[in-house]
């Protein structure tokens, strides 16, 4: 499969590029920066928020599917966040419709539901039917991008999978990560499952590993063929206790739900 991968120079993008290539997919890299050393394949230094530039990439490369990982990975003003996550998604979707590309896999975030209280115990997990409860403008933009994906799936019959990524790290570093961790290998498994699942329409899954202490339900991903193999519990003994642990576990978005991230929606001179 020829996969257009946005944000290909980012931390997730580099891992997914190698993982999908190892599984036989051809990666077309797209990012605002120059081609990273060692990348093999076509590369386009393009801003996904520029619809004409995005359309030109589709015209040149004829991808079979899109993996959209691009976007500012932290908090900003509301306009900055909407541009980074919603307008980029819309530009890609318009190009997909124009060039008859059927499938997109989107890197959404746990922060789309980050103000959701932590489940009371391990027998209760948060499903894909929970209402949006963003914890930041970053989370708001992920909710809005998911809504645009849902619209295009309904309007044009696209297949769109939103992966609400937890904590993508080589290994868990805090107590919260024991619930939210997504290993590098499981991330690749998740993306490939979302790319190859039979006609999912619009779907949401939680991008986490098979963590013993997980807060989110893995069943939505399993319905699409995502079978995580790693468990943060393997590292539990090496994770130090911290004074912030109790606060970070109050809501599933962790520190993003705290007052540290409260700010006006709009920047003023």
For each predicted feature, which ranges?
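Conserved Rossmann-fold NAD(P)-dependent oxidoreductase catalytic core, especially the SDR/UDP-sugar
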Residues: 91-132
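Alpha-helical substrate-binding/gating segment
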Residues: 165-171, 181-202, 210
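N-terminal Rossmann NAD(P)H-binding glycine-rich loop of SDR-like oxidoreductase domains
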Residues: 3-23
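Glycine-rich NAD(P)-binding loop of the Rossmann-fold in SDR/ketoreductase-type enzymes
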Residues: 49, 65, 80-91, 99, ...
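Conserved catalytic-site region of short-chain dehydrogenase/reductase
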Residues: 75, 107-123, 137, 143, ...
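Catalytic helix-loop patch of NAD(P)-dependent Rossmann-fold dehydrogenases
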Residues: 83, 119-157
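NAD(P)H-binding glycine-rich loop region in Rossmannoid oxidoreductase-like domains
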Residues: 46-85
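Conserved beta-loop-beta element that borders a ligand/cofactor-binding pocket
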Residues: 109, 146-170
């Amino acid at each position: 499969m020829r996969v257009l991968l946005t944000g290909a120079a980012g931390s997730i993008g580099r891992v997914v590029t190698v993982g999908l290539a190892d599984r036989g997919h051809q990666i077309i890299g797209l990012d605002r920066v120059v081609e990273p050393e060692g990348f093999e394949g076509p590369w386009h230094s393009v801003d996904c928020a520029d619809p004409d530039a995005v359309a030109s990439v589709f015209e040149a490369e004829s991808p079979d599917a899109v993996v959209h990982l691009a976007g500012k990975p932290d908090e900003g003003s509301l306009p900055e966040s909407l541009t980074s996550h919603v307008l980029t998604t819309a530009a890609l979707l318009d190009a997909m419709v124009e060039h008859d590309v059927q499938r997109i896999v989107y890197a959404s975030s746990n922060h789309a539901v980050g103000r959701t209280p932590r489940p009371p115990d391990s027998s209760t997990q948060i499903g894909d039917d929970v209402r949006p409860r963003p914890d930041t403008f970053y989370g708001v933009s992920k909710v809005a991008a998911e809504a645009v994906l849902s619209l295009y799936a309904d309007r044009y019959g696209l297949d769109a999978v939103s992966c609400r990524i937890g904590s993508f790290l080589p290994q868990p570093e805090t107590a919260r990560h024991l619930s939210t961790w997504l290993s590098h290998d499981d991330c690749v498994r998740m993306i490939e499952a979302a790319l190859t699942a039979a006609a999912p329409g619009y779907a949401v899954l939680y991008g986490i590993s098979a963590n013993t202490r997980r807060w989110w339900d893995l069943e939505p991903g399993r319905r699409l063929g995502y079978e995580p193999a790693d468990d943060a519990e393997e590292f539990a003994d090496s994770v130090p206790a911290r004074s912030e642990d109790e606060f970070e576990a109050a809501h599933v978005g962790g520190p993003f739900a705290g007052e540290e991230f409260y700010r006006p929606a709009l920047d003023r001179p």
